[in-house]
Amino acid sequence: MAKEKPILNVAFIGHVDAGKSTTVGRLLLDGGAIDPQLIVRLKKEAEEKGKAGFEFAYVMDGLKEERERGVTIDVAHKKFPTAKYEVTIVDCPGHRDFIKNMITGASQADAAILVVNVDDAKSGIQPQTREHVFLSRTLGISQLAVAINKMDTVNFSEADYNEMKKMLGDQLLKMVGFNPDNITFVPVASLHGDNVFKKSDKTPWYNGPTLAEVIDAFQPPEKPTTLPLRLPIQDVYSITGVGTVPVGRVETGIIKPGDKVIFEPAGAVGEIKTVEMHHEQLPSAEPGDNIGFNVRGVGKKDIKRGDVLGHTTNPPTVAADFTAQIVVLQHPSVMTVGYTPVFHAHTAQIACTFMELQKKLNPATGEVLEENPDFLKAGDAAIVKLMPTKPLVMESVKEIPQLGRFAIRDMGMTVAAGMAIQVTAKNK
């Protein structure tokens, strides 16, 4: 049995009309992950619905409602092999009302491909594109490549490609802390497959890698196995004859049968009996594994989604308050002391109150612009002190980055995103 290729999780981000789903569909098809017969069937279906050209995107848009609307809603996971990796695609939704999915989706990615429409050079960078790139950066994705798509609509013009590339570098990438010189840009036409898996003869002026080769050039993630165990709970099931089975993804550390564990902020203590993934028992599970596990001594009513599992010797931190660096993405008015929106951190959703606005920063450089500002508005970056209204596990990004990041939502939109830089633990 040949050793399995390492898995690389790649998020596809960008504006809804940039052709992300088509790009992903093309990678899956040319990568041999889709039966070509399926594409023929979907093509017919797309033509009947008056959406010819959407057939690749149909592959990702599994849900019927999504097919009708032509919008990707839930985060879809699909796999295809490249020369080096088994790539799992995290296709992140583009529409603003699905940004929450984007936040939970992007945090599972090792690298991101930003898909942009070459035509945006004329209309300017879409706000959604900015938000996705910024969120990816905040969520800790340090590897990024850019696919400049729909090159067929500008006759594969090198000038248009260069204009878009420069605009992205100057007006977006530098601002959020990516160095454009270290980022690979690829001119693609996903609908026809140009430079996706196969080199295109229509871009003789481009001698860089294809999109599949760019993915192969990403570095594999280092699993944070040496950090303390942290496993945010997604769901809790009660299975007859087995008992309580919490489900979640190991973020850091290692979990195995026999471990003495604690759920915080619930405070429930138990012992791991079994660990399972895809209905198979495991001797242990490590970061990235989505598992179900059986715990002795803990009932279904004792724990819930948003609790975090750790070892009793190093329990998760329940925050009395925390200091965070945030960036305000959008807000109809201003944020002031006393503002209490909902924080989405790991699997928890808890309202937190702004206790202090300590510093306003330059979002591009991090330098302090103002001490103790009176308010924050869209586009501002800041250091703030926050207090959860209910018990919440939060870790400092310096210690356990996977549990230090969050998004702030209000009025049905993501108003800000950030990370905890210092956490004051609650006294028991």
UniProtKB/Swiss-Prot annotation:
Domain of life where this protein originates: Archaea
Protein residues bound to GTP: 14-21, 91-95, 149-152
Enzyme class, spelled out: hydrolase
Binding site for Mg(2+): 21
KW Disulfide bond (keyword) present: no
GO molecular function, one term: GTPase activity
Segments for region (G4): 149-152
Subcellular location: Cytoplasm
Name under which the protein is recorded: Elongation factor 1-alpha
Origin species: Methanococcus maripaludis (strain C5 / ATCC BAA-1333)
